C-alpha cells in the first residue's frame, strides 16, 4: 500500500486518481501513525519551498520522513516534493530542505547564455533524456515527453542521482534517485503513458521491497 503525504500543498486529487487507474491501494494522511501503515510514500507538492518546509517542520513530518528513509523504506517526491529532497533552496534567501539528496534549488534566471530572455516558469511538455535507463524506476518507460510546471530547478554536482534529465535553456534534473529516495520534477500523474509507467514502476519497487523484507 502507498501513502500520500497530505501537508496542504500537494496535488492530491490527481495523484490519487492516477494510483486508482493503476489499481494500487493507497491512503492519504498527514498523520505519521497512519502513514506508517504504508509500504512506500509519495511526497507531492505545488507552491513555495519555504512554506512547504515550514509546514513539514511544524507538523513533525520532517522527522517522520527522515526516519522513514533511514529505515530503508521508499519515498517518491513529485514536483516541489522532489525539490524538498535536496539540501536547500534560495527562495526566501535560504530555506533548508530535507537534505536527503545533495544539491540546492535555485530559480531559473530567465536569461540564456546568449543574453536572450526566456519565460519562467518552465511549463508544458518536454522531452526526457535517460541517464540511467536500466534503473528500475525507468524499466520499460519510453524516453518521451512529460509535463513540467516549475520556476525553480535543482543544481547538484552528484551525477549519480540523475536518472533522467530534460532541457530548458539549461539541463533540468527530471528524475532523481539514490537508493530508496526517488523524485520526479515533472508531474507523472499528468504525463500520459510515460508518467503512468513511472508510477507503475514505483509501485512495483515498493511491492518488491515488501517481499524482500519478508
Swiss-Prot record:
Transmembrane segments: none annotated. It is found in: Cytoplasm. Its EC number is 4.3.2.10, 3.5.1.2. Pathway: Amino-acid biosynthesis; L-histidine biosynthesis; L-histidine from 5-phospho-alpha-D-ribose 1-diphosphate: step 5/9. PANTHER family: IMIDAZOLE GLYCEROL PHOSPHATE SYNTHASE SUBUNIT HISH. It comes from the Bacteria. It comes from Halalkalibacterium halodurans (strain ATCC BAA-125 / DSM 18197 / FERM 7344 / JCM 9153 / C-125) (Bacillus halodurans). GO terms for biological process: L-histidine biosynthetic process. GO terms for molecular function: glutaminase activity; imidazoleglycerol-phosphate synthase activity; lyase activity. One of its GO terms (cellular component) is cytoplasm. Residues 1-212 form the Glutamine amidotransferase type-1 domain. This is Imidazole glycerol phosphate synthase subunit HisH. CDD domains: GATase1_IGP_Synthase. It catalyses: 5-[(5-phospho-1-deoxy-D-ribulos-1-ylimino)methylamino]-1-(5-phospho-beta-D-ribosyl)imidazole-4-carboxamide + L-glutamine = D-erythro-1-(imidazol-4-yl)glycerol 3-phosphate + 5-amino-1-(5-phospho-beta-D-ribosyl)imidazole-4-carboxamide + L-glutamate + H(+); L-glutamine + H2O = L-glutamate + NH4(+). InterPro entries: Class_I_gatase-like (IPR029062), GATASE (IPR017926), Imidazole-glycPsynth_HisH (IPR010139). The active site is at residues 79, 187, 189. IGPS catalyzes the conversion of PRFAR and glutamine to IGP, AICAR and glutamate. The HisH subunit catalyzes the hydrolysis of glutamine to glutamate and ammonia as part of the synthesis of IGP and AICAR. The resulting ammonia molecule is channeled to the active site of HisF. Keywords: Amino-acid biosynthesis, Cytoplasm, Glutamine amidotransferase, Histidine biosynthesis, Hydrolase, Lyase. HAMAP family: HisH. Gene3D superfamilies: 3.40.50.880. Its main location: cytoplasm. Pfam families: GATase. Heterodimer of HisH and HisF.
Amino acid at each position: 500500500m502507498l501513502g500520500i503525504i497530505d501537508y496542504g500543498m500537494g496535488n492530491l486529487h490527481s495523484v490519487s486518481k492516477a494510483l486508482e487507474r493503476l489499481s494500487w491501494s493507497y491512503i492519504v494522511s498527514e498523520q505519521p501513525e497512519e502513514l506508517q501503515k504504508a509500504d512506500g510514500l509519495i511526497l507531492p507538492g505545488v507552491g513555495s519551498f519555504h512554506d512547504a518546509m515550514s509546514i513539514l517542520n511544524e507538523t513533525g513530518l520532517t522527522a517522520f520522513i527522515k526516519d522513514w528513509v533511514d529505515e530503508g523504506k521508499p519515498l517518491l517526491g513529485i514536483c516541489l516534493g522532489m525539490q524538498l529532497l535536496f539540501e536547500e533552496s534560495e527562495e526566501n534567501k535560504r530555506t533548508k530542505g530535507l537534505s536527503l539528496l545533495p544539491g540546492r534549488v535555485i530559480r531559473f534566471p530567465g536569461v540564456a547564455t546568449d543574453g536572450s530572455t526566456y519565460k519562467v516558469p518552465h511549463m508544458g511538455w518536454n522531452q526526457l533524456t535517460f541517464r540511467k535507463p536500466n534503473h528500475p524506476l525507468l524499466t520499460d518507460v519510453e524516453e518521451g515527453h512529460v509535463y513540467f510546471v516549475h520556476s525553480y530547478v535543482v543544481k547538484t554536482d552528484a551525477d549519480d542521482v540523475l536518472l533522467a534529465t530534460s532541457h530548458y535553456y539549461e539541463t533540468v534534473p527530471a528524475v532523481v534517485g539514490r537508493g530508496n529516495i526517488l523524485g520526479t520534477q515533472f508531474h507523472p500523474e499528468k504525463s500520459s503513458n510515460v508518467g503512468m509507467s513511472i508510477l507503475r514502476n514505483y509501485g512495483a519497487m515498493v511491492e518488491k521491497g515488501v517481499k524482500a523484507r519478508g
